[in-house]
Amino acid sequence: MGIVYRANTSADVNITVPRSGTTHRAIVVFPGYIMPGGTLGRAFAPYVADDDALVVVNYAERGVNVSQIYAKVMEALHKLRPVELRVYGASMGGMVAKLFLDQYRQAGAPYGKIILILDSAPVSRNNVKRPAFLFDVSCWCRGGPLSSAVWAAASQFGPKPPTEDDASQEIVREARHAGAWIGMPAATSQGCFIAKFGVLKEGELLDVAQQVVFLQGSSPDDDPLIRISDAISGWRTAFPNLMVITVQGRNARWHLPLVEYPRETVRAMIATRS
């Protein structure tokens, strides 16, 4: 079925302009693969500062084209003209953020050194609590409508994380529905991308980032998907002075409940000052 199944291969970005009308800081958000960018942008928007702009990446249904993503993000930043740039990568999005910064460096870092926030982000397939063979399979198993329907059915079961009191329940429902119906092409694209992610070089983020922060939920060892301590050690290779912040109101047993805890997440995201 996967051989004849077609999926969208174009990424795009969702832009939230500052409430003040003038951009001081732009926050580029790289979510995990199954989180729709527009939905996450709506969840985060009420909690950023009045002069903050959000540029949230919405991945293609199949494949991660970093050059395409870079071009879309930079086009958005050119329109916003920020003074300060902050980059946030959640789960697999941290890896995408790193590759984005590789191209940003090659372009001469047009907005200067950035602040990079990594939220429960792996740095290699070994940081992910899944059998290794699944990553290899994901690079040749494309997925199709039948496997996507099975994914959606399976996603309906199991406990769901609680939410903050002021989290939009409409946005939560929308994000969960989108995650359930994201489809196997997206799931296999995510696995293959992680499988092919290269080893970090010592100190390689020092010339492009003024600060790197790693966010983790409380009880980080309980994260069901990521070996958090191993991931932190891996990112420290690229930025030795990496800072770790625990989001106390967000239990790690849910991995990344971003739309369920937008206020706590954004508060941690913007807490570090440049």
How should each PLM-predicted stretch be described?
Residues 68-85:
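Conserved acidic catalytic loop of the alpha/beta-hydrolase fold
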Residues 88-97:
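Gly/Ala-rich beta-loop-alpha elbow adjacent to hydrolase catalytic centers
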Residues 240-274:
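Catalytic active-site module of serine/aspartate enzymes centered on a nucleophile-bearing elbow/loop
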Residues 129-174:
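Helix-rich cap/lid subdomain of alpha/beta-hydrolase
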Residues 159-244:
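Serine-hydrolase catalytic core
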Residues 59-62, 114-129:
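Active-site nucleophile loop of the alpha/beta-hydrolase fold
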